[in-house]
Amino acid sequence: MARYRHSRSRSRSRYRRRRRRRRSRYRSRRRRYRRSRRRRRRGRRRGYSRRRYSRRRRRRY
């Protein structure tokens, strides 16, 4: 059991590292939309569930 847990944590850290690298690439592009999106988000948040909205956002960019 201990061995399984160790391997799992290792794979997770590797995935996280890869994800971070990808994020930095699009950071400059996303910064532009952050301000405009925040204002809109407050009104829309009530109507849509959080999970559904986040999925939609991801597809757009």
From Swiss-Prot:
Which tissues show it?
Answer: Testis.
Residue ranges of the region described as Disordered: 1-61
A Gene Ontology molecular-function term? DNA binding
Q: What does the entry list under GO cellular component?
A: nucleosome; nucleus
Task: Report if keyword DNA-binding is assigned.
Answer: yes
Domain of life, per UniProt, equals Eukaryota
Q: Supply the InterPro entries for this chain.
A: Protamine_P1
What GO biological process terms are annotated to this protein in UniProt?
chromosome condensation; sperm DNA condensation
Q: Which UniProt keywords apply?
A: Chromosome, Developmental protein, Differentiation, DNA condensation, DNA-binding, Nucleosome core, Nucleus, Spermatogenesis
The listed locations are: Nucleus; Chromosome
Keyword Signal attached: no
Q: What does this protein do?
A: Protamines substitute for histones in the chromatin of sperm during the haploid phase of spermatogenesis. They compact sperm DNA into a highly condensed, stable and inactive complex.
Family per UniProt? Belongs to the protamine P1 family.
Q: What is this protein called?
A: Sperm protamine P1
